[in-house]
Amino acid sequence: MDIFIDYETICINCQEKGYSFGYGMKTIEYRGFKILDLPQKNLNGATVYFEYENKPVLLKSTENQHYSEFGKFSMINARVGKSGLISRFTYSFSFPRKKPDEKQKPKIIEYVDVYRFKDKPYFFIFYTFRNLTGKPIKNFNFYQFYDFDIYGEDSYSNDIARYDSKSDIIYQFDNEKGLDMSLFAGIGSSSKNKPNNFECNTPQDIFIFKNNQVSLRNYAEKGPCDCAVALQWIRPIFKHNDLISFPIMMIAGLGNKNFFENVKDARKDLEIHQKSVIRAVDNISREKIDPKLQKLNFSKREWCK
C-alpha cells in the first residue's frame, strides 16, 4: 500500500468485530513516512455548521458521535467491502420532535464513503448529506480541517502550509527538505467543487468558530512552524429531501512536481468514482439501522464487556 491509514478505534475486540468509533484517522503514512500523526480531534476531518429553525448547529469531527441540545448525531450503519479498500458509513443527526403526533424525528442523514487504493498516492472520502427535516436548511457549511505533521511529530515545527489557487489544493511540506525533495500532503475536491474559503494557520489559531464567525479567513500561506489547513464549502439553501455531496481527495507526493502530478491523476479518478458513490447512497440498505450499533450506542463501558 502506498498509503497506510491507522484508524482510531475503541478497543482491539471492537475492531475484530468490524466496528469502530467511526472513521477517525490516527496516523497516515505515505511510503513509510508519516503525514498525519495523532492530530487534534477537531482538526481531523469534517465539520458541519448550518442553521435550522433560525438556530445555529455546529458538529465538529463528524466521524464521532455527538449529543447536544439540538439533537443526537450517531453512526447507524457500517460496512466494509470484501477487498477492505472501500468502507461505507451512515450517520444520522436527529432533531427532537416538536409535536407529539410527529411520526418521525426530523433528521439529516450523512453518508461517508472511503475509497483506498493499493498502489496510488491518494485516497478519497465522499461526504453526502440528505435533508429529511421537512424544512429547508439555511447556510449549510462543510469544512475539512487537517493538522498534518510532515515526517511525524518530531518534524512538525518545520512545516509550511500553502493554498494553490490554480488547482484549489491546500497542502503542507517540510521546509528543511525543500520544495524539490520534501514529502507533501494536501486535500482538495473535484474540478466542479471549488472551495468558497480556505485557511493556512497554526493548529491553535486556525478558525474554530469563535465570536460567531463561520468563514475561513483565506490565509494562503503559513510557516515554517506547526501548521494546519482547512477548506470550506457553502450551500445557501439545503432543501428537504435534497442530496448534497462533497468529494474529498487526500494526496501525497515526493517533491513539488510529483505532488502536483498526483493531484491531476487523483482528480480524474475522483470524478470517475463519484458516480458509483451516488448509486451506493441511493441503496436503501444504507439507512438500515444496525441493531448492534443501536443497542450499544457507542458506550465504551458496554462495548468492551
Question: What are the residue ranges of the model-derived segments?
Answer:
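Aromatic sugar-binding interfaces of carbohydrate-active proteins
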Residues: S157-I160, F246, D269-I272, S276
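N-terminal targeting leaders for non-cytosolic proteins
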Residues: I35-S68
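Short, basic/aromatic beta-hairpin or loop at an interaction surface
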Residues: V214-C225
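Beta-strand-rich interaction surfaces with strong enrichment in secreted/lumenal proteins
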Residues: V112-Y115, Q232-I237
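Non-catalytic terminal regions with compositionally biased, polar/charged low complexity
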Residues: F259, K264-K305
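Short Pro-Gly-centered flexible turn/kink motifs
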Residues: P236-L254
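Polysaccharide-binding surfaces and accessory modules of carbohydrate-active proteins
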Residues: M1-C11, Q15-Y19, G24-E29, P39-N42, ...
